[in-house]
Amino acid sequence: MAGHTTADYISHHLTFLTTGQGFWNVHLDTLFFSLVSGVLFLFFFYRTASKATSGVPGKFQCLVEMLVEWVDGVVKDNIHGSDVRHQIGSLALTIFCWVFVMNAIDLIPVDFPPQFAELLGIHYLRAVPTADISATLGMSVCVFALIIFYTIKSKGLGGFVKEYTLHPFNHWAFIPVNFLLEAVTLLAKPISLAFRLFGNMYAGELIFVLIAVMYMADNIIPQVLGIPLHLIWAIFHILVITLQAFIFMMLTVVYLSIAYNKSDH
């Protein structure tokens, strides 16, 4: 462990494994656990699909079919164009499952990942990718790019320009004002998407760290109280990680449906 005081302990658990400097600073632990989460999700779905049967399905096949049908229903309720429904449906399913797996890493006891990393000579390690703003912002930027893409796909480049220059005031004199208002609204979508997921997961991770600090106390009372508190928060956090994955997926679908479905002004 990097330090022996409470402040050192908390700081150690909130420090990323990084490489590079300044703008080129890369959080290696975030990249690693993001990729591992994606591989686990793909492996689970591939394994289930390869063993799928038209007869009595297994429990994993039932789970996957329920997920696919549920996400497909969500997308159908929001996307009117059948030509893009399958594309956005696949994206929504990937987002929900991938974000859920990344969030679920937070249920691993906070000391396990850094202690295992210490055995490999790695002094700092944060295991929850969605507690890193760079990860959530990266995903949100991708959603932002898709919003632009589907707006142009649905309305054409001319319709895209018109939408952000002649609304809400349909007069050429208000083009600067319209553009400013629409640009703020558009940019707020990925920013709010990123910070909502990051804020909830960072807070959840920090609470687990603070509960772990109780085990370091000299008094036996906080040590004993730490056990039920950890269990209660872990159970509640299962709801949080699921809800945050759903919210990120749902907002992505809603934003893309607005981009694709909205009529020209």
From Swiss-Prot:
One term of GO molecular function: proton-transporting ATP synthase activity, rotational mechanism
GO cellular component: plasma membrane; proton-transporting ATP synthase complex
Membrane-traversing stretches: 26-46, 88-108, 132-152, 168-188, 195-217, 231-251
Cellular localization per UniProt: Cell inner membrane
UniProt keyword annotations, A-Z: ATP synthesis, Cell inner membrane, Cell membrane, CF(0), Hydrogen ion transport, Ion transport, Membrane, Transmembrane, Transmembrane helix, Transport
Keyword Zinc-finger: no
Membrane topology: Multi-pass membrane protein
Any single GO BP term: proton motive force-driven plasma membrane ATP synthesis
Function: Key component of the proton channel; it plays a direct role in the translocation of protons across the membrane.
NCBIfam families: ATP_synt_6_or_A (TIGR01131), PRK05815.1-1 (NF004477)
Entry's family note: Belongs to the ATPase A chain family.
Complexes and interactors: F-type ATPases have 2 components, CF(1) - the catalytic core - and CF(0) - the membrane proton channel. CF(1) has five subunits: alpha(3), beta(3), gamma(1), delta(1), epsilon(1). CF(0) has three main subunits: a(1), b(2) and c(9-12). The alpha and beta chains form an alternating ring which encloses part of the gamma chain. CF(1) is attached to CF(0) by a central stalk formed by the gamma and epsilon chains, while a peripheral stalk is formed by the delta and b chains.
Family annotation (HAMAP family): ATP_synth_a_bact
Protein name, per record: ATP synthase subunit a
Species this chain originates from: Histophilus somni (strain 129Pt)
